[in-house]
């Protein structure tokens, strides 16, 4: 390890000084340099390239658990401890998580729904349980931009989102309309949010009722009742940013993060370290396999529900 340190620092300091500080001989260092590289060291060097590629592709968002999964997916038989060591040697550190400010405005006279979700943050199929919430970002020195998002608890897929400089019902309705257009859920969906006035508003509740969606709301002042959305916003600000130079920069960055990275590529620990889109594709494939098995055994084939569909000009296309 001392010789490795000297080799790394000899461009900054003389070998003589480094050897003297570390109490090793110059001849010993030069003899070490002349030795052929070991198989383990050569493999470490190769793996470091893959580790850094995964780290850079995630734009410095991935720590050792997800980078380890990336390597396993590439058929690299490497331990988690080795990945940690290689990252430490290369100085690769994922972005630090920050606390963020809540934006709930619950001082209103609108009716409030019961907490029907009751912290049951799992779903057996898509479009059974959605959760929604709003957070804020700092723009410039004192400006603000609000992000409203809706997440499907089955796959943690962000099905709808919207941004605005104003935190009002129009913002949350825009996110809801995106989710409804994207998913076309059947009657019976449970929609959970906090007691904020933007979700309790008559306009928002009218849309839910018209689509046969049941409303559920967290208890007042209890962020744990909507913990999955709180965690999502924390992840966004940890892996992306909590402030931007302009609204335009924020909108482009959020689109890239949510639609390109989070939904399609980001590994999720709750989903077995696969992305929301990959988890949904796997669910579709398993559902079709089960249907084929029923047909082979002589059972009648049941209609396959359009769980990830968008209706365009009378035809149904799959969306992930």
Where are these regions (language model features)?
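Charged DNA-binding/catalytic regions of mobile-element recombinases
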Residues: 1-320
């Amino acid at each position: 390890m001392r010789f490795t340190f000297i080799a790394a620092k000899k461009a900054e300091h003389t070998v003589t000084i480094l050897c003297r500080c570390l109490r090793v001989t110059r001849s010993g260092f030069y003899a070490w340099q002349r030795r052929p590289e070991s198989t383990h060291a050569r493999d470490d060097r190769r793996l470091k390239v893959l580790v850094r590629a995964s780290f850079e592709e995630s734009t410095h968002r991935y720590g050792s658990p997800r980078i380890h999964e990336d390597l396993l997916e590439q058929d690299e038989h490497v331990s988690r401890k080795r990945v940690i060591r290689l990252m430490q040697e290369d100085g690769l550190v994922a972005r630090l998580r920050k606390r963020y400010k809540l934006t709930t405005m619950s001082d209103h006279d609108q009716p409030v729904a019961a907490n029907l979700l009751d912290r049951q943050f799992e779903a057996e199929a898509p479009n059974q349980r959605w959760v929604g919430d709003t957070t804020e970002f700092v723009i410039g020195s004192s400006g603000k931009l609000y992000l409203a998002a809706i997440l499907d608890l089955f796959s943690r897929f962000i099905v709808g989102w919207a941004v605005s400089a104003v935190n009002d019902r129009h913002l949350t309705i825009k996110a809801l309309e995106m989710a409804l257009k994207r998913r076309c859920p059947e009657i019976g969906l449970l929609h959970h949010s906090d007691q904020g006035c933007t979700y309790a508003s008559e306009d928002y509740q009218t849309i839910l009722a018209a689509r046969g969606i049941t409303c559920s709301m967290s208890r007042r002042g209890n962020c744990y009742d909507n913990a999955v959305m709180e965690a999502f916003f924390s992840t966004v600000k940890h892996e992306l940013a909590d402030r931007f130079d302009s609204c335009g920069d924020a909108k482009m960055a959020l689109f890239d993060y949510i639609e390109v990275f989070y939904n399609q590529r980001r590994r999720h620990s709750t989903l077995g370290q696969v992305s929301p889109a990959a988890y949904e594709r796997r669910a579709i494939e398993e559902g079709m396999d089960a249907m084929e098995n029923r047909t082979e055994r002589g059972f009648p084939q049941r209609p396959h529900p359009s769980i990830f569909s968008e209706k365009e000009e009378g035809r149904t296309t799959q969306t992930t």
